[in-house]
């Protein structure tokens, strides 16, 4: 799989999805800033600048991929919004934006499940040739402070997850490190687990 590095601090999820779309439809989804920003501007959970998982799934579906969304909690939440200089009213508006994207995804027939899942389930989907857009504490993978980010998980081989980190590139992550990145998303960042299963 070809790597594409995000060009903005806000386009990590968009860049991760772009790599998946390019892998399936390289002519229609070239790895460039125009397509990265197309995804971002069509998925931004306004007024915040992060992408909505439901909007990302919609974009993938419109591009011809089979999509399935699993979230620990359906409603949008941003516990450390004050550190990003957002106001509570802006987070409430982002919750509404998220609901609109979720409604549109349901109308398009995208399965949306609200439940917990494990890395074992992620592995099973990888064995079935799926790509997984997965939210983790990327700080563990990047050896930095905790940060909630989406990465594209493309394979599990001999005890290692092969991921495309839109900031770092392709990485081989040992199982224990991936488990830490998965678990500390909840314990350190207070964010729910989320994934889009792409085929």
Pin down the residues of each PLM region.
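Intrinsically disordered, low-complexity boundary segments flanking structured domains
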Residues: 54-57, 119-123, 180-186
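Active-site-adjacent substructure of cysteine-protease-like catalytic cores
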Residues: 84, 89-161
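Noncatalytic regulatory segments and standalone regulatory/sensor domains
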Residues: 44, 126-127, 137-199
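A broad, low-specificity signal marking well-ordered, structured residues that form hydrophobic/aromatic
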Residues: 37, 67-68, 132, 151, ...
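Active-site nucleophile-adjacent alpha helix/oxyanion-hole segment immediately C-terminal to the catalytic cysteine
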Residues: 1-70, 124-128
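A basic- and aromatic-enriched beta-loop-alpha substructure that forms the phosphate/nucleotide-
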Residues: 61-100
């Amino acid at each position: 799989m070809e790597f594409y590095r995000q060009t903005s601090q806000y386009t990590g999820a968009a860049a991760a999805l772009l790599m998946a779309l390019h892998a399936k439809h390289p002519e229609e989804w070239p790895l460039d800033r125009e397509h990265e920003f197309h995804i971002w501007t069509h998925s931004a959970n306004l007024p915040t600048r992060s992408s909505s998982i439901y909007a990302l799934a919609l974009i993938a579906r419109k591009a011809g991929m089979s999509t399935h969304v699993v979230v620990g909690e359906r409603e949008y939440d941003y516990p450390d919004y004050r550190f990003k200089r957002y106001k509570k009213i802006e987070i409430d508006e982002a919750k509404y934006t998220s609901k609109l994207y979720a409604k549109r995804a349901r109308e398009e027939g995208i399965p949306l499940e609200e439940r917990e899942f494990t890395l074992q389930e992620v592995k099973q989907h990888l064995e079935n040739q799926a790509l997984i857009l997965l939210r983790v504490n990327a700080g563990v993978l990047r050896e930095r402070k905790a940060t909630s980010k989406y990465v594209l998980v493309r394979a599990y081989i001999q005890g290692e997850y092969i991921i495309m980190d839109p900031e770092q590139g392709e990485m081989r992550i040992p199982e224990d490190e991936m488990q830490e990145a998965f678990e500390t998303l909840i314990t350190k960042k207070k964010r729910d687990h989320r994934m889009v299963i792409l085929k």
